[in-house]
From Swiss-Prot:
Keyword set, alphabetical order: ATP-binding, Cobalt, Cytoplasm, Magnesium, Metal-binding, Nucleotide-binding, One-carbon metabolism, Potassium, Transferase
Binding partners and assembly: Homotetramer.
EC number: 2.5.1.6
Known cofactor(s): Mn(2+); Mg(2+); Co(2+); K(+)
Transmembrane segments: none
This protein's name: S-adenosylmethionine synthase 2
Gene: METK2
Length: 390
């Protein structure tokens, strides 16, 4: 049997780049909760003892940016300089201006356009992907790497492994076979975890705890065998972490946010962007389209692309490829997609309820992936049943 290896990585919520994504989306949540018409493009960067938020926000909301930064850092677990950042005593810098009036008139006519007329906030192309290899219709490599990261955070916060600190990375290599275009996982080849830890714990304890409390509950036993390789904190020491160890920036983990290297990516990041930014809303609706194709039994694997011009409501192109796994021709699937999904930005905001912020709605997306999540706030994961015409 001919097989191949493919790898996906993830980082957990204490990674500096992910900290920035979560701050940017916490600010988006706060703006949309008070003013659903908020126009938000919020970036965050961080380094030792400092977090800065900057960008363009036009909103009627009254937002305490500094409080949101400190609260978000504290929730993640950055409560002292020892762990990489002290939420209550770090410097918080804010440099936020209004959205450019040139963009405002072109996209939403200074809020005068009807929803179906609202143009894309920028040019760009986005991809959605789905595969039948997991119940989530997501790639197994990505699902396992992401769940390992989430479990690391869980056992840190519930004190199962009190030696853990917030920063950490995971990576999973899976051996696959190609079944006429569909991906079939055979086994997990390699598991890599690098996690920040305190000064007291031994490397043996780290390896033992990670196997028992993180790997065993996450990776199904059927995928593990005597040849599976484990690299557990292979650098030997990871005490200094978070923004103290590395600078962080919003939008630097776009593959972790999506499909772990499978499918394709148009390059646009998600966090800190309101739904007129098609980098985000466009990527969400093509995930829904691709997932619906697979869930409806029209293909075992599917990728959908959409593209936009700034200020123009209708997409420039929509593309579908089922990797030769389709039960009907791709051209017929494309017709079904165009009939069932409205790719105009204003209509995506309505149909996917994207103008609703607050209650961590967007902040939740900013760690552990935007897709394959079982949560009613992830409206783009709702399947539309697609039926070919008789």
């Amino acid at each position: 049997m001919e097989t191949f290896l493919l790898t996906s990585e993830s980082v957990n919520e204490g990674h500096p780049d992910k900290l920035c994504d979560q701050v940017s989306d916490a600010i988006l949540d706060a703006c949309l909760e008070q003013d659903p018409e908020s126009k938000v493009a919020c970036e965050t960067c961080t380094k030792t003892n400092m977090v800065m938020v900057f960008g363009e926000i036009t909103t009627k909301a009254n937002v305490d940016y500094e409080k949101i930064v400190r609260d978000t850092c504290r929730e993640i677990g950055f409560i002292s300089a020892d762990v990489g950042l002290d939420a209550d005593n770090c410097k918080v810098l804010v440099n936020i201006e209004q959205q450019s009036p040139d963009i405002a008139q072109g996209v939403h006519g200074h809020l005068t356009k009807k929803p179906e007329e609202i143009g894309a906030g920028d040019q760009g192309h986005m991809f959605g992907y789905a595969t039948d290899e997991t119940p989530e219709l997501m790639p197994l490599t990505h699902v396992l790497a992401t769940k390992l990261g989430a479990k690391l955070t869980e056992v840190r916060k519930n004190k199962t492994c009190p030696w853990l600190r917030p920063d950490g990375k995971t990576q999973v290599t899976v051996e696959y076979k190609n079944d006429n275009g569909a991906m079939v996982p055979i086994r997990v080849h390699t598991v890599l975890i690098s996690t920040q830890h305190d000064e007291t714990v031994t490397n043996d304890q780290i390896a033992q705890d990670l196997k028992e409390h993180v790997i065993k509950p996450v990776i199904p036993a059927k995928y593990l065998d005597e040849n599976t390789i484990f690299h557990l904190n292979p650098s030997g020491r990871f005490v200094i972490g978070g923004p103290h160890g590395d600078a962080g920036l919003t939008g630097r983990k776009i593959i972790i946010d999506t499909y772990g290297g499978w499918g394709a990516h148009g390059g646009g990041a998600f966090s800190g962007k309101d739904p007129t930014k098609v980098d985000r809303s466009g990527a969400y609706i093509v995930r829904q389209a691709a997932k619906s194709v697979v869930a409806s039994g029209l293909a075992r694997r599917c990728i959908v692309q959409v593209s936009y011009a700034i200020g123009v409501a209708e997409p420039l192109s929509v593309f579908v490829d089922t990797y030769k796994t389709g039960t009907i021709p791709d051209k017929d699937i494309l017709v079904l997609i165009k009939e069932n999904f409205d790719f105009r930005p204003g209509m995506m905001s309505i149909n996917l309820d994207l103008l609703r912020g607050g209650n961590f709605r967007y902040q939740k997306t900013a760690a552990y992936g935007h897709f394959g999540r079982d949560d009613p706030d992830f409206t783009w994961e709702t399947v539309k049943v697609l039926k070919p015409k008789a």
